[in-house]
Amino acid sequence: MQGAQTSEDNLGSQSQPGPCGYIYFYPLATYPLREVATLGTGYAGHRCLTVPLLCGITVEPGFSINVKALHRRPDPNCGLLRATSYHRDIYVFHNAHMVPPIFEGPGLEALCGETREVFGYDAYSALPRESSKPGDFFPEGLDPSAYLGAVAITEAFKERLYSGNLVAIPSLKQEVAVGQSASVRVPLYDKEVFPEGVPQLRQFYNSDLSRCMHEALYTGLAQALRVRRVGKLVELLEKQSLQDQAKVAKVAPLKEFPASTISHPDSGALMIVDSAACELAVSYAPAMLEASHETPASLNYDSWPLFADCEGPEARVAALHRYNASLAPHVSTQIFATNSVLYVSGVSKSTGQGKESLFNSFYMTHGLGTLQEGTWDPCRRPCFSGWGGPDVTGTNGPGNYAVEHLVYAASFSPNLLARYAYYLQFCQGQKSSLTPVPETGSYVAGAAASPMCSLCEGRAPAVCLNTLFFRLRDRFPPVMSTQRRDPYVISGASGSYNETDFLGNFLNFIDKEDDGQRPDDEPRYTYWQLNQNLLERLSRLGIDAEGKLEKEPHGPRDFVKMFKDVDAAVDAEVVQFMNSMAKNNITYKDLVKSCYHVMQYSCNPFAQPACPIFTQLFYRSLLTILQDISLPICMCYENDNPGLGQSPPEWLKGHYQTLCTNFRSLAIDKGVLTAKEAKVVHGEPTCDLPDLDAALQGRVYGRRLPVRMSKVLMLCPRNIKIKNRVVFTGENAALQNSFIKSTTRRENYIINGPYMKFLNTYHKTLFPDTKLSSLYLWHNFSRRRSVPVPSGASAEEYSDLALFVDGGSRAHEESNVIDVVPGNLVTYAKQRLNNAILKACGQTQFYISLIQGLVPRTQSVPARDYPHVLGTRAVESAAAYAEATSSLTATTVVCAATDCLSQVCKARPVVTLPVTINKYTGVNGNNQIFQAGNLGYFMGRGVDRNLLQAPGAGLRKQAGGSSMRKKFVFATPTLGLTVKRRTQAATTYEIENIRAGLEAIISQKQEEDCVFDVVCNLVDAMGEACASLTRDDAEYLLGRFSVLADSVLETLATIASSGIEWTAEAARDFLEGVWGGPGAAQDNFISVAEPVSTASQASAGLLLGGGGQGSGGRRKRRLATVLPGLEV
């Protein structure tokens, strides 16, 4: 881990002193309540809700998320500051009922309370005092009925807010502009700031707010730690924060263990390791969350590009709904996936011998069945009797998922449950072929409208949670109790550094710099540069980064030329790249075997999407990963210090301090979680602060107070790294069958080849008269060798097209090890590029592993199967339902698979992915434990239709399954939605594009006289300006090929004297009439034998396609000839 930084380097030292939080008051008359509702967690009858902290909607622009909070005064003349960041969400508690609910289904609060009880989690117990009255915290002159009240609280002091130990000081009010509303904020200080004490009536407490925190925040933490006494957990967290007890074991007495742990042959060690992992997560996770964080651009709500074209509040709310729809697949995946992080149920230990590494013998398990089993306390006494649930025993297999399991996933919080239900409304149902069910309309008008419904009693069947559950019932996962070691699915924001091109981090040189900066005369040609250069070449051909063409092909000649131009650009880049590797003596054949796709999961809470659900998922993901990476450390320490019959709390009393102290150096920066340790200082011995004692009495004075930091070291998390090996190197026979490439030639080589999607896209352009589909036409050609020719078209052109497609497809099938059918020209070019590199590296036997992105696409569909569009209106019959929904539409979301994830990763996506953390030791006697976060697989058939196993694509027959060599990641780009796209610092002049285009033409046509094409390109770009070109102009435009300037000027002069129109078509026709086309001059060549000495050959090295070498005696070698001959 990186050493402590100086005070000038970290955000904590740069933050300013301030309070522990603020109470914000927004005027109801001007505040955008519907936008807040779309961002929040309101439900029918809510008294408090959570909303993301965003500049411009909940806090003022320029709000600092990092602060040095004044939280204590040991004596009247000294203050203690603590560096912390704000909590990701704010809590709306005053007049919260004025915010519309995000989900209108009734009965959520009662359902959550009942389900919490049957799962054994304790409910919120209010303090034995009344909630603070508005007069205690409202500034003078404000009417409490005209304002909405919300609390923004810091991470380090949210437990103090929960327990009513903060003091609001209305006399220190500040007027701030939040969006279009003139709002007011009042600071909150800890009661320890007042040495003489504060009357309890002056301490701010709101039972509805604390209940919301108990349900929406702390119950989720308790679930991640597998403890059921939530209130006691909050007390321990407050004590740890207040008294700095991070190295003291706290939660072990609260732990509960299922029967599988109690009955395990090594149950004593398993209980100790489980408890120790939870203790480490409790010690380190709060420290990481309250550390200072970078302020991302997405925090500025008032500058979201999402609202760029919105006129009026209705359009803004509609834009927010569309944005929320794009996030729905991430939320639904966590509900529908069997291995969701929400269903992680405990720690298991393998009993097998030899197969599992010792460090992987302890692992995290998941299973809804385990979560509802009976449990025992650390002293092996029964403490929770369990819950049977509906068919949980699974008489005919796994148990059935029930509404109660959905409530469990939402942490028994009606606020979170409403938000989950809102996202699930965007999802499409998948009807099982085995269980025929009634139509949605029949259900809504029948069972849902019955008074027997426990939630809505038949009054609001269209929006009832039971109706939503019925519509999606076949997508929910089975209820099982598993002890397998499977990945778990995490969700959050992607980091800024991802390497997801086909070859991942191949030749990135990041970890190989031993002596700092390299000399300028030895530049590194990295794989990243290669991809950037390729994109630049394609842009010169009129192809943008997404594969879109500036000029579409209009016939077979244009179609063939389009691909030949792309092929030439790719081949030129590959030759240059391979030459560079050979020149620098890079052992690329070995390096390609160890390359990975790399993805980063950001640990910045404010980089997460603006949604309380993602705050919950981020907390759960971080706590689970911390426990996972701590398991081998706890196991080794328990092996060295066996429990010998001690209970986990007893064992931890004697060993936890040492274990906690060593965890930082043993687990951080060891392959998965990266963090930095920062030293926080305050530059001045004193600071200007209000006189809080006087302010409490209503008098506002300033004073200069001596201060010091109460906590100096801060652990700032950065990223969690997830990898995926590109080249298969394993020995497992089953896996090998999935990756091995068949040597038999396939009959359908064209429809599985690189051109098929383009042939389908331009089918009507190429064959305007045919009624045959493109699939049948080209499949038929591969068997019968015939293509139709439209009337009036050139048979030669279509013959050339067919031969080009046939030859290119055959060559592609022979060399291809990237199992995708490219859908755009960028993917086509990258596939050709990487196939050439892999062939040069000798990797032709196995397909490589791929990461495909599942990118959401919103769509508007008829509302027949989406009853929630009707709202709370009553439904009398199925016919009335059909009539009511016939004219309505519903917004739904589906995911489309992308062939290459790299372009999506550049757009700062929100990602949902499965991860497995493997542990291993170093090499050459290094006994340190390292971790590797490996990309895994989703479990559950209802996650997404793209993940369902298909028997084949088109007419393709494949022996090995492709699922093992294709990993999937849900990815929602945020660039252009919540983050502005970067504008180019410098604009490109037109003359630069002309020059680059001419150089590209000459570079690609070194074997033939290219003056003809250069002149036509010049005329097309400059028109009549060509007549006035000087020699200096021509030499500049031709760049390093300026020797052609005279020939180009002579040809332009010939065109000018002819008097023809200055267009590319007219110039081409004229020159073809004069010269007979490019290369038509019939010169008489003789063969000249040129002796070359062996010594000169050895010194010259490998020459690949040099420029300006004269006539055909030294033609540029073909790529297929060059690459196999490369030797390092």
Curated annotation (Swiss-Prot):
GO MF assignments: single-stranded DNA binding
InterPro entries for this protein: DBP_sf (IPR035989), Viral_ssDBP_head (IPR043031), Viral_ssDNA-bd (IPR000635)
GO cellular component: host cell nucleus; viral tegument
GO biological process, one term: bidirectional double-stranded viral DNA replication
Main location: virion
Keywords tagged on the record: DNA replication, DNA-binding, Host nucleus, Virion, Virion tegument
Record's subcellular location: Virion tegument; Host nucleus
Region (Required for nuclear localization): 1104-1128
Role, per record: Plays several crucial roles in viral infection. Participates in the opening of the viral DNA origin to initiate replication by interacting with the origin-binding protein. May disrupt loops, hairpins and other secondary structures present on ssDNA to reduce and eliminate pausing of viral DNA polymerase at specific sites during elongation. Promotes viral DNA recombination by performing strand-transfer, characterized by the ability to transfer a DNA strand from a linear duplex to a complementary single-stranded DNA circle. Can also catalyze the renaturation of complementary single strands.
Subunit structure, as described in the record: Homooligomers. Forms double-helical filaments necessary for the formation of replication compartments within the host nucleus. Interacts with the origin-binding protein. Interacts with the helicase primase complex; this interaction stimulates primer synthesis activity of the helicase-primase complex. Interacts with the DNA polymerase. Interacts with the alkaline exonuclease; this interaction increases its nuclease processivity.
Name of the protein this chain belongs to: Major DNA-binding protein
Lineage, uppermost ranks: Viruses, Duplodnaviria, Heunggongvirae, Peploviricota, Herviviricetes
Gene designation: DBP
